[in-house]
Amino acid sequence: MSLEVFEKLEAKVQQAIDTITLLQMEIEELKEKNNSLAQEVQSAQHQREELERENNSLKEQQSGWQERLQALLGRMEEV
C-alpha cells in the first residue's frame, strides 16, 4: 500500500516538474517577445521623433513661402 502512495506521489511530483518546465519555457518565450516588442516600440518612437522634426521643418518652409507670397502680392498691389 505504501508503494501505491509512493507511486502516486511520484506521478504528482513528475507532473509538477513537467508543468514547471513548460511554464519556464513559456516565460522564456514571453521574455523574448517582450524584448522584441520593446525594440519595436523604441524604433517607432525614433521614427515618430524623425517625423515630428520633418513636420516642423516643413511647417517652417511653408511659413517662409507664405511670407514670400504675401510680399509678392503686396508688391503686385502697389503696381
From Swiss-Prot:
Residues 36-45 have a biased composition (Polar residues). Keywords: Cell cycle, Cell division, Coiled coil, Cytoplasm, Septation. The keyword Cell division applies. Residues 3-79 form a coiled coil. GO terms for cellular component: cytoplasm. GO terms for biological process: division septum assembly; FtsZ-dependent cytokinesis. Residues 36-64 are annotated as: Disordered. Residues 46-57 have a biased composition (Basic and acidic residues). Pfam families: ZapB. Its main location: cytoplasm. InterPro entries: Cell_div_ZapB (IPR009252). It comes from the Bacteria. It is found in: Cytoplasm. Homodimer. The ends of the coiled-coil dimer bind to each other, forming polymers. Interacts with FtsZ. Belongs to the ZapB family. Non-essential, abundant cell division factor that is required for proper Z-ring formation. It is recruited early to the divisome by direct interaction with FtsZ, stimulating Z-ring assembly and thereby promoting cell division earlier in the cell cycle. Its recruitment to the Z-ring requires functional FtsA or ZipA. HAMAP family: ZapB. This is Cell division protein ZapB. It comes from Salmonella arizonae (strain ATCC BAA-731 / CDC346-86 / RSK2980).
